[in-house]
Amino acid sequence: NVGVTFIDYLDKFIEMKDKWGTKKVYVETRKKIEMFDPNATFQTINLEWLSRFENWMKESGCGVNYTGKQLRNIRAVFNYAIDNEVTTLYPFRRFKIKKEETVKRSLSVEDLRELKDYDVQEYQKKYRDIFMLMFYLRGINAVDLFNLPPLVGNKIVYRRAKTNRLYELKVEPEAMEIIQRYKGENYMLDVLDIYKNYLDFLHHLNTALQKIGDVKRVGRGGKKE
């Protein structure tokens, strides 16, 4: 396919995805590739390209696991293209995607209390508050939380993007206080009004919370989409 860029094919790949949450993850990868090398093709994305992309992500302040997610998305597109006989090239045979181990335990009640009451720096307050909101809303997934429409009353009803399962949550006073503090224009919270992509916000959230004393943010309030 002469003249067809990797981004051109990625756009078609994204269109075939049914779930909005999945689409958004690949849209994020598309943005990174567009910033790094918008004219990349299946032919030019080789071992050396992957290494340069990985280093560029690192220099841009992205974490190991966040970078790994983007690389796995690129790999998924290659696998799909190979299955559909679009290309026979596969640069991942000799490229190992790095992964940073995370603590497998959950935060204890004492950890959460310490995090809630911790005297954080000004820039960390929002990240701490949003994490606590995830906890107050029974571990709601980030993609679901940030896409909720403006709140009406004191109940949240939503379908989880990953499973399509219906949930109903009562908003307790502690959660309501945070929601009102970061009220959005088009959504319940202002995260997507400001960041446009929830993955960018989550990256900053994890980085900020890891600097709050010895309290570590674990799990992003549920499994990452």
Give the location of each predicted region.
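Basic/aromatic-enriched alpha-helical hairpins
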Residues: 2-60
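Short, basic (Lys/Arg/His-rich) helix/loop patches that form interaction surfaces
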Residues: 122, 206-225
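Short, contiguous acidic/charged loop-to-helix segments that flank catalytic cores in large enzymes
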Residues: 120-121, 157-167, 192-201, 220-225
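Major-groove DNA-contacting interfaces characterized by cationic-aromatic clusters
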Residues: 177-208
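N-terminal DNA-binding recognition helix of tyrosine site-specific recombinases/integrases
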Residues: 32, 40-45, 59-92, 138-140, ...
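Short, leucine-enriched amphipathic alpha-helices that occur as contiguous helical runs
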Residues: 26, 112, 126-128, 202, ...
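Conserved tyrosine-mediated DNA breakage-rejoining catalytic core shared by Y-recombinases
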Residues: 146-181
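Basic, Lys/Arg- and aromatic-enriched nucleic-acid-binding interface segment
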Residues: 68, 87, 93-142, 146
